[in-house]
Amino acid sequence: MKIAILSRDGTLYSCKRLREAAIQRGHLVEILDPLSCYMNINPAASSIHYKGRKLPHFDAVIPRIGTAITFYGTAALRQFEMLGSYPLNESVAIARARDKLRSMQLLARQGIDLPVTGIAHSPDDTSDLIDMVGGAPLVVKLVEGTQGIGVVLAETRQAAESVIDAFRGLNAHILVQEYIKEAQGCDIRCLVVGDEVVAAIERRAKEGDFRSNLHRGGVASVARITPQEREIAIKAARTMALDVAGVDILRANRGPLVMEVNASPGLEGIEKTTGIDIAGKMIRWIERHATTEYCLKTGG
């Protein structure tokens, strides 16, 4: 099987592991920078070119598309899809998951529990927005933020008003969310492949912080998840129509709450913590689904 990995940096852990896992199972792998792909959109002879050459047909494409290049990255992936390549996460699903507001709306519609959340663009009535989510303490986020950037814990009403007013000056979309104190700076990252949670870790924030992101200095350990948490993680990934997803869950007194569904979850922290060959599981999923029938069905 010929597999393309779409990534701006092939030296990253996740890309290297996926490449190794694919090669170990006898596949040919090429890492392509999606921003260097350019496309001929033609009803008679569509194609993708890369650094001066027309690309051959790939049986499957693994998107490792960063948030900053979502628009062009998903456009390139969509072109591969139109040419009959099987995508490990479809372009439309990635775009859906990257839209935090749309994601939360879809999860809520499916009855998946979330922290109480409000969203606004430059709200005129900051006080009412704070009341809407139950008052302080609360978390204020920029909708476009990633890896804990643009996330502030406001412990008092006055602090919340100050943060919201400051964000309002950025002319940005603001997300205001209840603070789950009982989570104590921890969350659970469930790695879903298909209809299975293949690994789970607990991420604990570093001292003095409440953001558990490993990129922000959080510490990971193996997590034992409940059947309810497993079911919610799988349901959240299905709601986003993602074959591979990192589902972040907070353990609240009222039950597990989904914080986020990540369409391009990093493998380093969770593989090194659990010792599970997640990259291999992803390749085996591709082997089961990147079939000749799929290629014919999609016109490749």
UniProtKB/Swiss-Prot annotation:
Transmembrane segments: none annotated. GO terms for molecular function: ATP binding; metal ion binding; ribosomal S6-glutamic acid ligase activity. Mn(2+) 1 binds at D248, E260. The keyword Ligase applies. GO terms for biological process: protein modification process; SOS response; translation. Residues 104-287 form the ATP-grasp domain. Binds 2 magnesium or manganese ions per subunit. Its EC number is 6.3.2.-. It is an enzyme of class 6 (ligase). Mg(2+) 2 binds at E260, N262. GO terms for cellular component: cytoplasm. It comes from the Bacteria. Belongs to the RimK family. This is Ribosomal protein bS6--L-glutamate ligase.
